Amino acid sequence: MDKMFKRTVIGAAVALASTGLMAKEVGVNSDFNVDVYGVAAMSVVNYNTTDNRDDSSGYVLENESRIGFRAHKEMFENFTVTMQIESGYVDSTDWGHGGVSGGVLGFRDTYIGASGDWGNVRVGRVLTPLYEIVDWPFSNPGLGAAFDWGGINAHYDRQSNQIRYDSPKFGGFSFAASVGRDDNDNGGGAATRDANFFGANARYSFEKITLLGAVESGTRVVAETGGDWELDNTGTAVQNPVVAGYDDDTFAYLVGFEASLPAGFGLAAAFKGEELDNGIRKHKQDSFSIVGQYWNGPLGIKIGYAANLDSKIDGVKQDDANNILSGQVMGVINGFVPYVRVAARSDFTSDKDTDIVTRVGLEYGF
């Protein structure tokens, strides 16, 4: 549950740090609301419990806690302006020794937006419409290495240079659409020349069933590499070969459903197709995900299976299929969610074996 507080303290601090004249010039206000929200999440995980290939790093702590701030105020009738900034996962980063800055504010959804009964517009860093559905409900519990970021990955996830519109509900129907330009690693803020994408999703709910569909298309620019100079073993300067850059046209789509079944059961399934085409080679791969769950009061059981099928390059099948079978037992105790998850990840290495992933954790949303 979001906790609300008036921005009087923040406004006062800004006013004290400024002259009275400057405060008036920048328009410091103290009459809008700020929501503070987040997730406290800690788990103990081993990604290779059976130590296949002598490749287990043992059990480690994963801190997936995050926090966000959302300020909002009605600018005029039926037009509410919202600013949100949200951190990434804290992880167990050693900041002093070059740790990845995933826990910084602005790493997750961070935007300026406006909303009313006409819908919601967000400008900044948000999920793409397709990835929103890929992520939930079809990548949980623990299916992301296959259905989310696994495979040839011809879709984006969260992008910075993006404008997204979400419609209101028209009966049981709603949709979202976005355009963007970002193509940096990890969705960084600097766009690449000629890189762009657009996407959309749609949902239709009736009775206890929701149908979902999404599509995304874009152009990724892969830069030229090589051409640098180095000394060979005789001390002679030689130039490394130049590998030409290229543009990858991307395309991805998803169709799926969620169903709430009698007696506490639920079922969700989706099929996803992806394609990369640079004009010289065409790389295609299909994936699917099936998730079932059962709830009896505060106790829940969730079982999921996701797989990437063998991809094809110019119609030739590749030997790169993999899959995950995952099960999770969880409870809800006064808002806290303790859980145990065991997953079998198969064919993710050249040995074509199965790694057993075990995780025990606790989460609490606020």
From Swiss-Prot:
Pfam families per the UniProt record, alphabetical: Porin_4
UniProt KW Ion transport keyword: yes
Molecular function via GO: porin activity
Family the entry assigns: Belongs to the Gram-negative porin family.
Name this polypeptide is given: Chitoporin
Biological processes annotated in GO: monoatomic ion transmembrane transport; polysaccharide transport
Gene induction: Induced by chitin oligosaccharides but not by N-acetyl-D-glucosamine nor by other sugars.
Summary of the function given for this chain in its UniProt record: Involved in the uptake of chitosugars.
Signal peptide: 1-23
Source organism: Vibrio furnissii
Compartments where located: Cell outer membrane
Keywords of the record: Cell outer membrane, Ion transport, Membrane, Polysaccharide transport, Porin, Signal, Sugar transport, Transmembrane, Transmembrane beta strand, Transport
Lineage: Bacteria, Pseudomonadati, Pseudomonadota, Gammaproteobacteria, Vibrionales
Main localisation: membrane
Topological relation to the membrane, as annotated: Multi-pass membrane protein
A GO cellular component entry from the record: cell outer membrane
